Amino acid sequence: LGIEPSGVFGPTNGRWSMIVRPGVVTGGNFLWGGCGLAAAVAAIEELSGRTCVWATAQYLSYARTGETMDVDVTLAVVGHQITQARAVCRVGDREILTVNAAVGERPFEYAHSFVKMPDVPPPSALKQRAHRSDVSNTIHEKMEERFVIGRELEELDEIPNDGRTLMWARIPDVIDGVDTATLAVLGDFV
């Protein structure tokens, strides 16, 4: 992502900056939303020293390739185990996105997943997703995307389906060391 600290104003607020560059943008040459969320989460985690457990973003505008995006972080409530945080991402005076997040962890002796992974073919059994346009210098150039359920562009017709899509997605450069920022980038498909 290329996000770097650019000013810490105290224990509960600080600023990070990143240049929106090729590789973190869409085909329209603006910041991929998941990369914006990832930048905010990375800054929140760095300031708080805690791992993100939940985050949501509201996208308000676009950050174009070559622009510098500042990420202003505020730790609104610092609890013993959980911190509530906010990040406002701007290019100049223009707000790009706002992020609210909870970071930290609470000891709990039980672990459970409430969602069962669907029974689907492995990625190696599926073909790489086709794109309508050139993906050079976009986030899609860095990803492998394979449809399990869904229709490729050439399969679209006038007949609607149930709207359900299942897809394998990964960033091969980040196979080892997947963190919450990486999951935020991939989460933009949801």
Where do the model's predicted regions map?
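Terminal targeting signals and extreme-terminal segments of soluble enzymes
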Residues: 1-190
